[in-house]
């Protein structure tokens, strides 16, 4: 039977919060009325060992995954930082490459101008070499020159005002009798007497002296006292003796304008220029072969039976002991 008064007290206690729920369930009055059904056996429900092992392995896998994720996150942080640095560096490199390309576009006309200036410089050097040996005046062809000589003959001294034709007066003073002239004045007079007469042939192909021609060739050769310097001296002397120094110089510049270097030009001219064909190389007497320029010592060979310049034999060195060696290019 239900106890209505007890249930009313319990309900009021539950509604008002005076009676805890656990206390109500712990003192259940209906426990004596109903027989509680107990499970078979004294042990409660338990999981099988297989299920327990599976649950345990699953927990381990989840934990391992968490550890791996954390490790990967820690590794990816510096990688991301390095990638960002690489991207910034690449952007800087790209900017610099674009700047270099822009500068190259600006330098291209300068390079073309450099080639033009090189060609102009080559032409000017040839023109100046010819101009040094041209005739400035071929005699008393102007009134100032005649007046200068007349004043000099009458008074014995040059006129007080600046004279245009001082070299002509120097020549007159050097040739006058009873006067003492310095060496520099004598040299100036000798140069005036050796000036070529101006003509079409001498203008285009001046007959340079062997020394001047060799010095002109030396400006195109690298180094000092090389076999090509000796070859330039030998060819200059032979060309001067044959009266073809101007033609030889023109042929030399022509080969240079084709893109060849000075060594190749001299070698080619020694084999093709008509003034050198079949010419025997000169003999140079030395104390011993140690006095031969050091760059030439490695090019000394035994003298062949019939050496000629067009076959590459530059000169023959003869020592005081009677030994001979030929310089070969």
Swiss-Prot record:
Q: Pfam families, alphabetically?
A: Filo_VP35
Q: Where is the VP35 IID domain?
A: 204-329
The domain of life is Viruses
Task: Report the subcellular localization.
Answer: Virion; Host cytoplasm
Keywords tagged on the record:
Coiled coil, Host cytoplasm, Transcription, Viral RNA replication, Virion
Q: Please give the GO cellular component terms listed in this UniProt entry.
A: host cell cytoplasm; virion component
Coiled-coil ranges (or none): 70-120
Q: Does the keyword ATP-binding apply?
A: no
Partners and quaternary state? Homooligomer. Homomultimerization via the coiled coil domain is a prerequisite for binding to L. Found in a trimeric complex in which VP35 bridges L and the nucleoprotein. Interacts with NP. Disrupts innate immune signaling in infected host cell.
What is the similarity comment for this entry?
Answer: Belongs to the filoviridae polymerase cofactor VP35 family.
Task of the protein? Plays an essential role in viral RNA synthesis and also a role in suppressing innate immune signaling.
Q: What is this protein called?
A: Polymerase cofactor VP35
Q: Which organism is it from?
A: Lake Victoria marburgvirus (strain Angola/2005) (MARV)
Source organism lineage?
Answer: Viruses, Riboviria, Orthornavirae, Negarnaviricota, Haploviricotina
């Amino acid at each position: 039977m239900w106890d209505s008064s007890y249930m009313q007290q319990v309900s009021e206690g539950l509604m008002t919060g005076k009676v805890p729920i656990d206390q109500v369930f712990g003192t259940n009055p209906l426990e004596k009325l109903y027989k509680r059904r107990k499970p078979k056996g004294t042990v409660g429900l338990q999981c099988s060992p297989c299920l327990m092992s599976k649950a345990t392995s699953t927990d381990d896998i989840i934990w391992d995954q968490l550890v791996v994720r954390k490790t990967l996150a820690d590794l990816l942080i510096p990688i991301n930082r390095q990638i960002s640095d690489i991207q910034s560096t690449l952007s800087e490199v790209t900017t610099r490459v674009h700047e270099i390309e822009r500068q190259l576009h600006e330098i291209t006309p300068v390079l073309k101008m450099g080639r033009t200036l090189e060609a102009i410089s080559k032409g000017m050097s040839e023109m100046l070499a010819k101009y040094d040996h041209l005739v400035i005046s071929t005699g008393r062809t102007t009134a100032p020159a005649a007046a200068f000589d007349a004043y000099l003959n009458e008074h014995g001294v040059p006129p007080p005002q600046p004279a245009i034709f001082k070299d002509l007066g120097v020549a007159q003073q050097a040739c006058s009798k009873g006067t003492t002239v310095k060496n520099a004045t004598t040299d100036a007079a000798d140069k005036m007497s050796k000036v070529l007469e101006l003509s079409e042939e001498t203008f285009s192909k001046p007959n340079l002296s062997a020394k001047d021609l060799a010095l002109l060739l030396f400006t195109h050769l690298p180094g000092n006292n090389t076999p090509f310097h000796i070859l330039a001296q030998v060819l200059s002397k032979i060309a001067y003796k044959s009266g073809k120094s101007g033609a030889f110089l023109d042929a030399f510049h022509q080969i240079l304008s084709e893109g060849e270097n000075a060594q190749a030009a001299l070698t080619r001219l020694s084999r093709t220029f008509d003034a050198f064909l079949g010419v025997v190389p000169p003999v140079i007497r030395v104390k011993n072969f140690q006095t031969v320029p050091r760059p030439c010592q490695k090019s000394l060979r035994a003298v062949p039976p019939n050496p000629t310049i067009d076959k590459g034999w530059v000169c023959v060195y003869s020592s005081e002991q009677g030994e001979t060696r030929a310089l070969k290019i």
